[in-house]
């Protein structure tokens, strides 16, 4: 493959991601408007309904855009998959256990703690120069536990779709360039799609953990880890302030 072909391949990938992000926002706005007209009583939850509706066609758009143009491999002497039984970046049948999941979950929590430490100085800096980060903080924390549409989207819908897109479609798009590049590029896109300053560093770092579990054990387990994290984050954000034991338990998890 020539340098020009590789450049065109990456240009196509970047344009596909940009089109996905723009299309997602446009469809979400259209659905919000339609929901507010058809169901005015659901206006407060229209954002979550709109995202549920919008992400599916956007994901299908990416799937059909890239399905016949992904590179199988750039290795000079690729291993015969029939002889080894699996590709080095497609080992979906490795033995998975609750202990393996706990191992990744603790790493995931630790990465969140580290990323929050990295984000705090930037938050302080931007607040000092007068930037209002209240919306970013609210979006990062999620909603209330009694907000059913929020729970469905954040705990179930978003993890499944995001993993299918970033550890599915883009994973396959980049895997010919090696494990590290695939982890970096898919994590970068994953962070960018959140469109939230406070979530960029955490999402980027957590993308590497999600890549690792996906690469070793399969997509279903990165989905499981993602939705478990989202569920725990919402519980801690809602109950951590009023129930000390919740915050203490989460702190022990981070220390582990």
Label each region the model flagged:
Residues 109, 113-117, 121, 151, ...:
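Mid-bilayer segments of alpha-helical transmembrane spans in multi-pass integral membrane proteins
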Residues 24, 59-63, 67, 115, ...:
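Alpha-helical transmembrane segments of polytopic integral membrane proteins
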Residues 30-34, 117-125, 164, 173, ...:
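Membrane-spanning helices that line or support transport/gating and their immediate boundary helices
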Residues 137-140, 150:
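Eukaryotic intrinsically disordered, low-complexity segments enriched for acidic and Ser/Thr/Pro residues
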Residues 1-105, 109, 113, 216-217, ...:
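N-terminal, membrane-interfacial amphipathic/helix-forming hydrophobic leader that caps
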Residues 125-135:
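Peri-membrane helix termini and adjoining interfacial loops of integral membrane proteins
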Residues 6, 10-14, 144, 148, ...:
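Primarily residues marking transmembrane-helix entry/exit sites
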Residues 147-256:
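Transmembrane helix-loop-helix hairpins at the membrane interface
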């Amino acid at each position: 493959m020539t340098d020009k072909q590789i450049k065109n391949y990456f240009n196509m990938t970047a344009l596909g991601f940009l089109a996905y992000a723009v299309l997602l926002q446009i469809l979400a706005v259209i659905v919000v408007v339609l929901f507010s007209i058809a169901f005015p009583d659901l206006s407060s939850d229209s954002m979550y309904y709109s995202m549920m509706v919008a992400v599916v066609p956007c994901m299908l758009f990416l799937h059909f855009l890239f399905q016949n143009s992904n590179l199988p491999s750039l290795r000079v002497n690729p291993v015969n998959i029939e002889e080894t039984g699996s590709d080095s970046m497609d080992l979906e049948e490795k033995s998975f256990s609750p202990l393996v999941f706990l191992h990744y979950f603790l790493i995931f929590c630790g990465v969140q703690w580290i990323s929050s430490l990295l984000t705090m100085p930037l938050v302080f800096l931007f607040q000092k120069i007068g930037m209002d980060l209240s919306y970013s903080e609210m979006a990062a924390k999620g909603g209330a536990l009694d907000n059913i549409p929020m729970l469905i989207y954040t705990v179930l819908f978003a993890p499944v779709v995001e993993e299918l897109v970033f550890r599915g479609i883009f994973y396959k798009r980049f895997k010919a360039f090696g494990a590290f590049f695939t982890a970096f590029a898919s994590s970068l896109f994953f962070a960018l799609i959140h469109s939230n300053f406070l979530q960029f560093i955490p999402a980027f770092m957590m993308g590497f953990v999600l890549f690792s579990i996906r690469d070793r054990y399969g997509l279903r387990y990165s989905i499981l880890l993602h939705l478990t994290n989202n569920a725990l984050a919402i519980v801690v954000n809602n109950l951590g302030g009023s129930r000390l034991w919740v915050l203490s338990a989460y702190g022990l998890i981070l220390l582990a």
